[in-house]
Amino acid sequence: MKKSINAWSVDKSICFEDMFCRVKTAGFDGIELNIDSEDNSAHSLALSSSKKQLDEIKILSEKYNLPVVSISTSLFGSNMGSAQQHERKTAQSLIIKQLEYAEKLGATGILIVPGGLSENVSLQKARENSLKTISDIKTEIEDIGIFVGVENVWNRFFMSPYDMCRFIDELDSAYIGAYFDVGNVVEFSDPENWIEILGGRIGKVHVKDFKRRNGVYSGGEWVDLLSGSVNWPKVVSALKIAGFTGYLTAEVEKTNPLQTQNEFCTMVASELENIICMEDEI
């Protein structure tokens, strides 16, 4: 497995070249970029990013030998499962845009977030809408040939790994699978069990750590990697058994305000290295 970090973990004021330099120097093997709202940060992609801008980012990636491993986004909201067709169309356009950027930057996958459950949209309807939103552009996804990872987030959509498996299996595509977020299930479950059940469906992995107050469903807080309730040896073992050999992408924030950006990146890279090395301790 290799070490990656999401660009959200880098201070918003840092430009693309400075970010690539710092992340590489810290010891990472790759980076995940994000499509955000206009001017969200000095290193965000936007829906309006030009070919010239993407070409410049690709040059930086090659200059620092730091591959762009995936394209995430903050723009999904509840669009994919919305009752409004125009919102679902917006979600489809975003997926296609992510795939286009991934193709230009050499990334091997993108992250998408199905959902839409609300007071006005039942879970069943949000699920049906989300499936249709993705299914209707499945041909485009397969033509581009880049992995689309469905992520588990705190939106009450995937409450068990079986929910996630069934959703992915119904889409029935070699290019659609799980973007599994280890930390997002810790409040109510154990990530190693999700990994065992999702198995080979997992194509991308986000890592962060969550400290339970007192067992599951007791609340808690986000903490530094290796400081929470995740049983990392079991997680790494489960990933290994599932055949996962890709990037572990840290999606984390500084918990120490006195820490510099360089210190933070170096710390996270070291934590990831320790996690990956747990393969040999099992």
Where are these regions (language model features)?
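N-terminal pre-domain/capping segments
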Residues: M1-E103, S135, S173, R212, ...
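Active-site-proximal loop/turn and secondary-structure-junction residues that shape catalytic pockets
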Residues: S9-D11, I35-D39, S74-G77, P114-S118, ...
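A short, acidic, flexible beta-alpha connecting loop/helix-capping segment that sits on the rim
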Residues: V10, T249-T266
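Conserved beta-strand positions in the central sheet of alpha/beta enzyme cores
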Residues: E32, S70-S72, L111, G149, ...
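A short acidic, helix-capping loop that chelates divalent metal ions and anchors anionic groups
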Residues: D39-S44, G77-S82, G116-L123, E187-F188, ...
